[in-house]
Amino acid sequence: MYMARCGPKNNVLCFPFQLSFLFSKRLINKRFKYTLQTEDEKNMMGSLSKNKIITPEDVEFKLAQLREFSNTLKERIHNTKSVNSDGHQSNSIAPISEDSRNVNVTKISSVPNEEKSKNLSDLIHSSFLEKMDHLVPKVIRERVADDDILAKNLFDRSHSNWAPVIDRLYVSEKRFMDIDSREFSVWLNGTVKYLPFHSILHLDEMLLEQINGDVVKFNTHMYECIFNNLGNLKPTNFNQDGTNDKVILKMKELLERYDKALKITEERINKKEGFPSKVPKMTQAILNNCLKYSTKCSSFHDMDYFITKFRDDYGITPNKQNLTTVIQFYSRKEMTKQAWNTFDTMKFLSTKHFPDICTYNTMLRICEKERNFPKALDLFQEIQDHNIKPTTNTYIMMARVLASSSSNAVVSEGKSDSLRLLGWKYLHELEDKNLYRHKKDDLNLFLAMMALAAFDGDIELSRALYYLFIAKKYKTLCANWKGNILVDQDTIWKSTLMPEMLNYLMLAYARFDPRNLPVLSGYEKGIELRRKFLREFDSSMRLDDTDKLVKFKLPFLPISDLNSEAQVLAESNAIWSFNLENGGTRNTLTSSNEAALEDIKKYRQLLDSFAQEAEDFNEFKFKVMYEVTKMQRESINVNVFNKISLHTYLSIPINLKQQKEFLRRLTFFTFQQHEFEAVIKRLYEGYRNIPSSHTRDQNSISTEAISVSKPETTEDLNLIMHDIWYITCLRHKIMMDTTLYELVMKAAIEFQNEDLAKKVWNDRGKFRTTVPFLKMDQRIRIAKDQKFAHLMVEFFTKQGKYSDAIAIILSSKNRFNWTYSMVRNLHKALEEIEDRNSVEILLDVVNKKSHAKALKWEEQELNM
């Protein structure tokens, strides 16, 4: 038993080991704090005369060294204790020898501080070297020849960065030469991960150099290491389809290298030059990495290439993990039929290929997209029948499937409330089981609850959930923020605000109905859960004053219950603007007259320079579009401003029957492609007749009038300023597409606005001639045209213009597959007025135009 003595006297108290270690630990901590404080004071004084700045990374590195030293010291003492603890009780007091009692403590304390600091540094350094021995082989550390690089990039294993280490080895003299390739490659495969592409190329070159270019010696571990790093890469934004992708090309190059190695091996055997000790082999892990990256690129061609290559050449068929990756690819590409076929194949191949919970969760995600709740219930029953343990995500996905299915009365078979109630019960079951939750599960759980509350029209619960999630995320980011919180508010809010949460909140506003009661208020457990969230929602203040430097606030109305349409419209506008202006850190949606004139003056000069520099109209148009995109990213939170959230935001005044507000939102946040091209063309033709801005006197430009080199009428000047302001306002606008045109037609039906219907009919006709529409797949174009024609029939039916509705059907009967569900309302209206002739014509079109004929016609049109 080790003892500790306090003071230099002979008659002293003796403490057991645990208490002694506690005292020594406190003493070390105290000395460390004093040392750090002294160093900080020295650094502060030294900064007056030196330009050296201590970065937060350096401080973190030093603290990590101190923590590692403390842990190592504790382990050493613990090991010493375990060796000497035999035959002693933990609470016994051993006698102290006379030699120990006569030690002069004052003599020990007289050792200079510099020597103590030096000894402490030596201990820390030795502990650090021991730690490095477990991370990298000794020969690698010697060739890197920079312990700082190793420490800063590898010390924290959860955030290790091997790229600087590999790059440093690449420029070293020996690289990987004279290292045993077998043992080294085993360590390499299990350690070096998440390299960027250029570092992967460096690593591959060094591995080839190590084996003197003999591809036969390029073993399986080396292949797996390279493919693993390639599979973890992300494709570039401009090459999402995988066409001529550098990573795909590198993977194919490695497979060609492997084929060459097999060929050389076979030739050596035939020439009786000896069989190699170990021939490299392709593995399932390599195939999975190839498929993983191919799915990221959304490249069906490359995925099919790798599956065929491994199956035919290497005898490796996709396993459970590979097939799950394929299903996930089909899910992202909206190829649900192929996903279901692959899933059924997995169930009937063998027990090794039978789907696991990850595969089932993927299929549940497809059920959510298809709003197929019967199939989701069958899948959940299969999970239970095969004794597969559901995960947290399984219950969450079931709730989301039921929520999305309840949004449509036809899909839900008239049982929307029952589906939402069942969705909440799955979440109650998840809470009762207390399953493990990943950090991403919290987001998915909130999204599931937001979906159920939004489709139920429960605004109070949706507001509470939105507030609680955004507040939690905001405070977490601020607590872990390394920079200046007040200065970096723009970045913090950009990371905090989420488009999915905003979309569900807007959906709750759109489904507002003060007469409906929430589903959760119908049973005790639901009442308790709802009351819990509403109690945590601070509806009056929404302000956190615990930290005076950080104030969190959302622009909700200071009332707990919204009970009027005006309140819903006002709050939805406030929340929408708050998200687009990035938490109020930007001022984009409102501007004074002076600011507007400044913007016009600024962008007139910019557009002038574009027109003079461009060789033709297309180049000028490209420059303007690029500038608009850049301007939008600088002034709007593009993460939340998308077509899905805008569609939901525009649907709020439609459902609340507020025509004026709908038209205001539509005009302010959307633009049309043909109008944009007309404005661009006018500006280009006008600027080509104006000298470059460098030849004009800059002082002649004022906020009241902008002089040009040729006489301009007031009408011309107003038109130019209008066009420039149109371009400036595009920063908060999204181009109208087929979905938004359908929404406008639904608004015309709801408001019975014939002028709006005619306008959207003409505007969509012009949109059909633009490049964005013509680039769409032809089957999609036909489906979109059919949907819009159906809405036109609904509009004329509500207007009582039955002959116009029938005319649309007859003019498109050879193009569209008109079903009875599409003309049901028209048929009922004709029956009511007893127009037998029109009913006969209508039913003749519906009955004769079978689905098979429609497909045949589409096939003929595609061939043409």
UniProtKB/Swiss-Prot annotation:
Known partners and oligomeric status: Binds to mitochondrial small subunit 15S rRNA.
Protein name, per record: Mitochondrial 15S rRNA processing factor CCM1
Transit peptide segment: 1-76
Gene encoding the protein: CCM1
GO CC annotation: mitochondrion
Chief location bin: mitochondrion
Gene3D superfamilies, per database record: Tetratricopeptide repeat domain
Note: Involved in mitochondrial-nuclear incompatibility, a major determinant in reproductive isolation between species, through hybrid incompatibility of Ccm1 and its interacting partner 15S rRNA between yeast species.
Residue spans of the PPR repeats: 319-353, 356-390
